[in-house]
């Protein structure tokens, strides 16, 4: 079985040599047959067209960290590792797109990243390795983080919002309440449809008044799986 490994650049300092080692080792039965390093191309992307202030609150990277970025790219080039980025899209969108392509080829994917936004991709034949925790993410980890199964993560994020990315969500609704609502009503769309029936006054009012924010938020947090990537998965 072919195993494709997709890695976000933030994992590189820990995993650059590990990837190389695994790719050459004959003893590792799960060694990747293909892998790529995925970079963000720029701060702004198509999501800023949906919501201008998306990630607008992000501060600049610490001064001592900035020089490392170019060394990461240089390391990737020096080791002749395939790297991919695409203007107007985030690295997460490319990972989502390539993951779907890999599944269509009947192969498996390992995503190496600590980014919680990638948890929505977790399913059969797609596993996620968190280099910060040195472990593979499980269904239980995702449930502990978001209170729902992987396919409903975006619905919880849409309601709760995300202050780190400036995703608005619905004011007054956190992850716990969002998970409660999604587990009860199934989807964000159904929550909004049935919002008038919710007994808690404040919660009902917030949902009714902020439907548009919730809908926009879901568009922001949902990863694109059909990005017009230039490189084929076999490259």
Short names for language-model regions:
Residues 6, 11-112, 116-136, 213-216, ...:
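Noncatalytic, basic helical substrate-engagement surface that gates or grips nucleic-acid strands
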Residues 25, 29-36, 79-81, 104, ...:
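Non-catalytic nucleic-acid-binding/docking modules located in mid-to-C-terminal regions
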Residues 1-3:
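Short, well-ordered junction/capping motifs at the entry into regular secondary structure
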């Amino acid at each position: 079985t072919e195993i494709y490994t997709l890695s976000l650049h933030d994992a590189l300092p820990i995993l650059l040599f590990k990837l190389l080692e695994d790719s050459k080792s004959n003893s590792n039965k799960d060694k990747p047959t293909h892998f790529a390093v995925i970079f963000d191309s720029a701060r702004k992307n198509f999501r800023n067209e949906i919501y201008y202030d998306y990630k607008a609150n992000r501060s600049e990277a610490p001064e001592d960290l900035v020089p490392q970025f170019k060394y990461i790219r240089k390391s990737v080039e020096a080791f002749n590792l395939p790297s991919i980025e695409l203007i107007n899209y985030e690295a997460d969108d490319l990972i989502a797109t390539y993951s779907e392509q890999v599944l269509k080829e009947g192969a498996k994917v390992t995503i190496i990243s600590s980014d919680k936004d990638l948890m929505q991709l977790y399913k059969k034949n797609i596993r996620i390795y968190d280099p910060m925790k040195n472990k593979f993410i499980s269904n239980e980890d995702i449930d502990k983080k978001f209170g729902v199964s992987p396919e409903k993560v975006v619905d919880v994020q849409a309601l709760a919002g995300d202050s780190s990315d400036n995703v608005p969500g619905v004011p007054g609704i956190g992850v716990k309440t969002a998970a409660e609502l999604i587990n009860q009503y199934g989807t964000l769309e159904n929550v909004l449809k049935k919002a008038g029936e919710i007994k808690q006054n404040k919660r009902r009012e917030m949902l009714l008044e902020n439907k548009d924010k919730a809908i926009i938020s879901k568009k922001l947090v949902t990863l694109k799986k059909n990005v017009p990537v230039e490189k084929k998965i076999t490259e």
